[in-house]
Amino acid sequence: MSGINKIVLAYSGGLDTSAIIPWLKEHYDAEIIAFVADVGQERDDLEGIEQKAIASGAVKCIVKDLREEFVKEYVYPTLKTGAVYEGTYLLGTSMARPIIAKAMVEAALAEGADAISHGCTGKGNDQVRFEGAVAALAPQLKVIAPWRLWDMRSREDLLAYLEARDIPCKATLKKIYSRDANAWHISTEGGELESTWNEPSEAVWQWTVSAEQAPNEPEYVKLTVAKGEVVAVDDQPLSPHQILTTLNERAGKHGVGRIDITENRMVGMKSRGCYETPGGTVMVAALRAVEELVLDRPTRAWREKLGAEFSHLVYDGRWFTPLCKAIVASANAIAEDLDGEVILKMYKGQVTAVQKKSPNSLYSEDFATFGADEVYDQSHAEGFIRLYTLASRIRAMKEQHQAIGGDHTHG
């Protein structure tokens, strides 16, 4: 295709993207640069990945370490909004896509590429997330999505394609599960999960143990929160990524952070997935505990509205939008007073905030007791209740008059 001389491919080293490299070369007669975003996925997935890319036909392989930036600039802002998609999903895959796409775009512009390519299927959410980010950041770049273009439909087709071209690949014909991992979570789909009547086997879970296998003794962890961000574990200051990896290991041993959900994809289909977010689940519990102490009722309600809206923005691939920036700004303002310390108990798949304190706490033992009237005079409640219930009383009086045939709506 004319006008495309260099393509940057989001490369994972797996079967799909290994086949995409030669396919792009054959169909576009262009140089292919493989781009690998390290967002904290399994270390085995990155071993020898540059050599794999070159062996598949890439002229170059760029590996970018995005782990700290991912947690600091994408995970933490999302946490401050309180975003949870459809009540349970902590947006692990969704949060990683915008930083990968942004880094890809930067690489493409630096390398003088004309297009980017990805291995997302035409049935999933990720194609929208990647291409939405490109449209927002560099609309002049063309996007090539081979799964929407080629006639290969199965692992057998891909393996045969590579074999015919003498391209080495360690992938096998049988792949039970489809997995995606980053520093925040790991997702598993496929296999027995394709039937919602099947209970996930233990082979599904990678980072967490079952409640039955978890230790019989609880473990406690202390988190320090500053302006809505976790900054220390057991009084030890760590970087955001270090905090997350530490909590992943400790919480995973207790089976914390497992969910099995059937979610609504933005393309209209439902999909079932098992997600493990051990460290993130502990972080969320700590932040909610500090919020309970610090935020007044209307501010807490507003933060919950922000989270509900932001969950859809992130899930739907609209990170680089004015609305996203506005919600993050509002969440940051709310988080200014979210300072505190929380001790959490991890036990048999559950995490519970058992101790919490904040210098900005609105809770006071003195104010909450029933014995003291210096702050709260109980007699004042009568007037408040009469005003608070005024609309209800007017409605009831109107209904009573109508029931006996009277109409006093006119003066």
From Swiss-Prot:
Record-listed L-citrulline binding positions: Y89, S94, N125, R129, S178, S187, E263, Y275
Coiled coil feature spans: none
Gene3D superfamilies membership: Argininosuccinate synthetase, chain A, domain 2, HUPs, Single helix bin
Pathway noted in the entry: Amino-acid biosynthesis; L-arginine biosynthesis; L-arginine from L-ornithine and carbamoyl phosphate: step 2/3
Record: residues binding L-aspartate: T121, N125, D126
Domain of life assignment: Bacteria
A Pfam family hit: Arginosuc_syn_C
Keyword Amino-acid biosynthesis carried by entry: yes
EC main group: ligase
Keyword Cytoplasm: yes
Catalytic activity: L-citrulline + L-aspartate + ATP = 2-(N(omega)-L-arginino)succinate + AMP + diphosphate + H(+)
InterPro entries to which the protein is assigned, alphabetical: Arginosuc_syn_C, Arginosuc_syn_N, Arginosuc_synth, Arginosuc_synth_CS, Arginosuc_synth_type_1_subfam, AS_cat/multimer_dom_body, Rossmann-like_a/b/a_fold
Gene Ontology molecular functions: argininosuccinate synthase activity; ATP binding
Subunit structure: Homotetramer.
UniProt xrefs under HAMAP family: Arg_succ_synth_type1 (MF_00005)
PANTHER family with a match to the protein in the record: ARGININOSUCCINATE SYNTHASE (PTHR11587:SF2)
Family: Belongs to the argininosuccinate synthase family. Type 1 subfamily.
Protein known as: Argininosuccinate synthase
Protein's organism: Aeromonas salmonicida (strain A449)
